[in-house]
Design a protein with these regions (language model features):
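Glycine-enriched alpha-helix->loop->beta-strand junction motifs that scaffold or abut catalytic
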Residues: 19-24, 84-90, 109-115, 133-140, ...
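Hydrophobic faces of well-ordered beta-strands that scaffold small-molecule active sites
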Residues: 1-6, 24-26, 65-69, 91-93, ...
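Catalytic cores of alpha/beta
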Residues: 10-19, 75-85, 101, 122-135, ...
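C-terminal alpha-helical cap/extension of soluble enzyme domains
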Residues: 76, 174-268
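Active-site-adjacent beta->alpha loops and helix N-cap segments on the catalytic face
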Residues: 32-56, 73-77, 95-113, 124-127, ...
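Glycine/small-residue-rich loop that forms an oxyanion/phosphate-binding "nest" at active or ligand-binding sites
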Residues: 61-94
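Conserved N-terminal beta1-alpha1 strand-loop-helix module at the mouth
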Residues: 1-64, 72-74, 136, 257-268
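Glycine-rich phosphate-binding active-site loops on the catalytic face of alpha/beta enzymes
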Residues: 24-34, 88-101, 139-151, 200-221
Length: 268
């Protein structure tokens, strides 16, 4: 599994790389994002700039650089061209709704770097079969924040407990496209603990996850706290993979569902 960390500071990116973070995630998406996620405890990377692509690619040697661009618009081609020219390894398209948008994204990139779709709209979910028919999709990440908003849900992990994530994954698997979903907290933190979410990633054979806001909170203390929690997460993932036949995945989901019921009681 690839672990992703949102970061635009080259010095910090190198530190994350050295501790084994697989991908540094540069977030250029700004179009419509504030309005969609207003009032939510989500990461909006206002300080990230397209000029950071070259700064990061010039210092990364083992970690890949993933760049989330803006939703498709009249400036997309120039944005994509600069990202590729400046050294991005993977480009991620957010907020797409149609096969046509995906095809345009794939055509502009033209196999020069890896492509990743961020599936996070109800329209894309309903049109998943048409979208998957496009050649050239390397990866799909299911974005729980915006997808749960798009579907009018109250908590992003309802998509997991309600079977929507698994439904999407079953659609993806025949196409041999790598996939991941959402973010993850340290093993013992988060509204739904990182350990419970990690077990779902293992059960569903996910190949990527983003280190979420509770990991950033550890950086307020010191880098060592972050690294210790990250290494524990990686080691736990290896343990679960090697012992998956002994893991009670069914009971894990029962616990997740109970926790979500309690969370929603407090929200409503």
């Amino acid at each position: 599994m690839k672990f992703l960390k949102i970061e635009n500071n080259p010095e910090k990116a190198v530190l994350f790389q050295n501790m084994g973070v697989d991908r540094i995630f540069l977030d250029l998406e700004i179009l419509g994002k504030k309005e969609r996620q207003k009032g939510l405890d989500t990461i909006i990377s206002e300080s990230h700039s397209i000029n950071d692509v070259k700064k990061l690619s010039s210092v990364l040697t083992s970690s890949e650089l993933l760049v989330r661009i803006n939703p498709l618009n009249i400036n997309s081609e120039s944005e994509i061209e600069k990202c590729i020219k400046d050294g991005a390894d993977v480009l991620m398209l957010p907020m797409f709704k149609t096969k046509k948008e995906v095809q345009s994204f794939i055509n502009i990139i033209n196999k020069r770097v890896k492509t990743c779709l961020l599936l996070e709209t109800s329209q894309a979910l309903c049109r998943i079969d048409d979208i998957l028919s496009v050649d050239g999709i390397d990866e799909i990440h299911i974005g729980l924040n915006d997808l749960h908003l798009s579907m009018g849900l109250d908590f992003m992990f309802e998509l997991l407990s309600g079977g929507i994530v698994e439904y999407i994954i079953k659609k993806i698997k025949p196409f041999d496209i790598k996939f991941g979903f959402g973010g993850i907290a340290p093993l013992d933190k988060g509204l739904i603990s990182g350990e419970m979410i990690l077990k779902e990633h293992v059960r569903l054979n996910s190949s990527s996850v983003i280190l979420s806001r509770p990991f950033d909170a550890l950086l307020d203390n010191d880098f060592q706290s972050f690294e210790d929690s990250f290494i524990k997460l990686k080691n736990k993932h290896s343990f679960l993979i090697n012992n998956r036949s002994k893991i009670d995945f069914k009971n894990n989901m029962i616990t997740i569902k109970k926790n979500i019921v309690n969370i929603l009681k407090n929200k409503l």
